[in-house]
């Protein structure tokens, strides 16, 4: 799976999503199905997009007791998506159960979906970490520790800010994957994400994959913006 560029399909209507994807008929896309879309359209949207040939990141961020997460992952494995995720804050036992469930649910002859863990949401800042979550460690320290726990649990990688990628790569294996949301163009508004970078900056920092949402989905010309950002992603050199 080569350096994916996932587009987050965060649409509130089926027709809007259809029109959006129709404008990309000439492109081979990687797409992300988040909670909003999955809870609205259910399994049908996964089957529809998989049959259409898209590579899928099913972004449900599971966080529950180990038994529940393990059984859920076993069911999700049958969907044959490419990437799934959990919250690292659920702990090692939960992450290990998630991996066991995926392994058990993956059909013979099929490749197990990559399993990654969310470290901290890109909407989280240091103030929230300290005042609301009562975590008295620096953001970088928390993210790296969660990444190490994910690796120790056998996961394939983590979701993190691109700014944190170099720290994670220094602390974890070279094969450990980093998927970075919070991707914008320089001209875009930041919105509710506080730790953001451009595609080229993410590549230079070592991100394996990026996730882009509103910069493309809310653009007047989504295809043109996608091509611009994808070129920035592909053309950048990893430092």
UniProtKB/Swiss-Prot annotation:
Record bears the keyword Lyase: yes
Family matches, as Pfam families: OMPdecase
Keywords in alphabetical order: Decarboxylase, Lyase, Pyrimidine biosynthesis
Positions bound to substrate: 10, 32, 59-68, 122, 184, 193, 213-214
Catalytic reaction list: orotidine 5'-phosphate + H(+) = UMP + CO2
GO molecular function: orotidine-5'-phosphate decarboxylase activity
Keyword ATP-binding: no
Role noted for this protein: Catalyzes the decarboxylation of orotidine 5'-monophosphate (OMP) to uridine 5'-monophosphate (UMP).
NCBIfam families linked to this entry: PRK00230.1, pyrF
Subunit structure: Homodimer.
Protein name: Orotidine 5'-phosphate decarboxylase
């Amino acid at each position: 799976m080569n350096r994916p560029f996932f587009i987050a399909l965060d649409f509130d209507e089926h027709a809007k999503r259809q029109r959006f994807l129709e404008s990309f008929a000439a492109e081979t896309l990687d797409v992300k199905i988040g909670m909003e879309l999955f809870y609205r359209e259910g399994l049908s949207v996964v089957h529809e997009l998989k049959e259409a040939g898209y590579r899928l990141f099913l972004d449900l961020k599971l966080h529950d007791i180990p038994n529940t997460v393990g059984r859920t992952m076993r069911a999700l494995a049958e969907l044959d998506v490419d990437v799934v995720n959990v919250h690292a804050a659920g702990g090692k036992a939960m992450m290990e159960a998630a991996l066991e469930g995926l392994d058990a649910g993956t059909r013979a002859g099929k490749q197990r979906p990559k399993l990654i863990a969310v470290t901290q949401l890109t909407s989280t800042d240091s103030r929230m970490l300290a005042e609301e979550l009562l975590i008295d460690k620096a953001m970088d320290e928390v993210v790296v520790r969660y990444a190490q726990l994910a690796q120790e649990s056998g996961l394939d990688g983590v979701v993190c800010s691109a700014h944190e990628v170099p720290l994670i790569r220094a602390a974890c294996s070279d094969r450990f994957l980093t998927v970075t949301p919070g991707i914008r163009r320089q001209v875009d508004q930041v919105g509710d994400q506080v730790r953001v970078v451009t595609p080229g900056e993410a590549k230079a920092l070592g991100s394996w994959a990026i996730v882009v949402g509103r910069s493309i989905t809310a653009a007047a010309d989504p295809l043109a913006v996608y091509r611009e950002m994808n070129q920035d992603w592909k053309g950048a050199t990893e430092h």
